[in-house]
Amino acid sequence: MAAGVAARTLRGLAVAGGGETSDSEDDGWEIGYLDRAAQKLKGPLPTEEKNETFKKALTTGDILLVKELLNSGISVDSSFRYGWTPLMYAASVSNVELVRVLLDRGANASFDKDKQTILITACSARGSEEQILKCVELLLSRNADPNVPCRRLMTPIMYAARDGHTQVVALLVAHGAEVNTQDENGYTALTWAARQGHKNVVLKLLELGANKMLQTKDGKTPSEIAKRNKHVEIFSFLSLTLNPLEGKLQQLTKEETICKLLTTDSDKEKDNIFSSYTALGDLEIFLHGLGLEHMTDLLKERDITLRHLLTMKKDEFTKNGITSRDQQKILDALKELQVDEIKFGELPEVTKLEISGDEFLNFLLKLNKQCRHLITAVQNIITELPVNSHKIVLEWASPRNFTSVCEELISNVEDLNEEVCKLKDLIQKLQNERENDPTHIPLIEEVSTWNSGILKRTALAVCGFGFLLFICKLTFQRK
């Protein structure tokens, strides 16, 4: 009984990727007894017994017995109870030698069971990346199509990206896999890699031309998916305006791409491509995003921080050896980073005697709306701000600088609150005088009540904004 439980447990490991399960509980496979000694046929076997022996030879990885059974006439594409072929099973456990033997004997590399292809099974197998890579390479060499999706429209490259297999992703693209295909939920291979936190896969996909702006069905980009799943570093460089790696390998031929991707020493490749993205400061990320990596050493030698770089004048750029072309890239990036200031010039000139009540009401409504926007902005900052300092990826200035700015903000909000209270008192005084004027014809009660309500809401919004800034100040002080 214990052996049966173990067999069922290990059988689950051979289920094809994406959660595709067998339609039959009693599938006839006994997976897990890989330490059995190689066996030989003692004589001709009945067909039913031969099939059972074939299954056992496959599950134990007995290559010699598999060859002997194939020589005896058993079909290399035998279909067992739940529809899997021997090749699909071999791919699911990343048995490279078994895959090679079966393919050499004519096994169909393009077979699928309910749209679950052998290539998808290999890409989602539970094994080392080296074994998976070799199995995938063998299948591709026998013309397995890398763009055939499963029932959920996931292609092999999505499974490889989801499981963090960088080299497998590169190999699939080299054989024609579409990088930007989307599954039933709108996920691309890049989205899956970002969701699972596989940084090297994300970088490789960007290098291979992945579109980081494609959205899922719920309107999320890969960077937003990474942020939602707490992968802050991936979110940081996916959010960059430019991508220095994008399309780097797209112009190479298939053979050149395979050679470049698979013969390069993995450690050297990481040093040349990925090391610049590990433990980066904000200056390095900014420069990489603009394709200005060559400026990193120059700026560090001169102790130029990102804050200093972003506030430089033209003569300072030239003085520090920054070329006109590089200057323009930085200035263009600055334009994108700028936030529109609140424009109060459009508000009516209250001092004019001919101003109407509607114009003044419009002024108050706009002021109230701006206050609400400010409150929402601070609430978002409080929500997104990391609680622990070790979660901050970019280099930050001293928290004291932020605290001092918050203190100044609180002071300004208190002043604003005081001025709004004065405005309210003044309007209330004018209202009282008009009500006591015997020549005044009173307005409709509803309008007066509504105007008073607007003033109250404005005052409450300003007070609420001050309270939120006070909370923000306490948050920074705790840090």
Swiss-Prot record:
First and last residue of the signal peptide: none
Record keywords, A-Z: ANK repeat, Cytoplasm, Developmental protein, Differentiation, Meiosis, Phosphoprotein, Repeat, RNA-mediated gene silencing, Spermatogenesis
UniProt entry tagged with the keyword Nucleotidyltransferase: no
Domain of life of the native organism: Eukaryota
PANTHER family hit by this protein: ANKYRIN REPEAT, SAM AND BASIC LEUCINE ZIPPER DOMAIN-CONTAINING PROTEIN 1
GO biological process, one term: regulatory ncRNA-mediated gene silencing
Name of the featured protein: Ankyrin repeat, SAM and basic leucine zipper domain-containing protein 1
SUBUNIT field: Interacts with DDX4, PIWIL1, RANBP9 and TDRD1.
Record has Metal-binding as a keyword: no
InterPro entries in UniProt: Ankyrin_rpt, Ankyrin_rpt-contain_sf, Asz1_SAM, SAM, SAM/pointed_sf
GO cellular component: pi-body
Entry's localization field: Cytoplasm
Function of the molecule: Plays a central role during spermatogenesis by repressing transposable elements and preventing their mobilization, which is essential for the germline integrity. Acts via the piRNA metabolic process, which mediates the repression of transposable elements during meiosis by forming complexes composed of piRNAs and Piwi proteins and governs the methylation and subsequent repression of transposons. Its association with pi-bodies suggests a participation in the primary piRNAs metabolic process.
ANK repeats: from-to residues: 49-78, 82-111, 114-148, 152-181, 185-214, 218-247
Organism per entry: Rhinolophus ferrumequinum
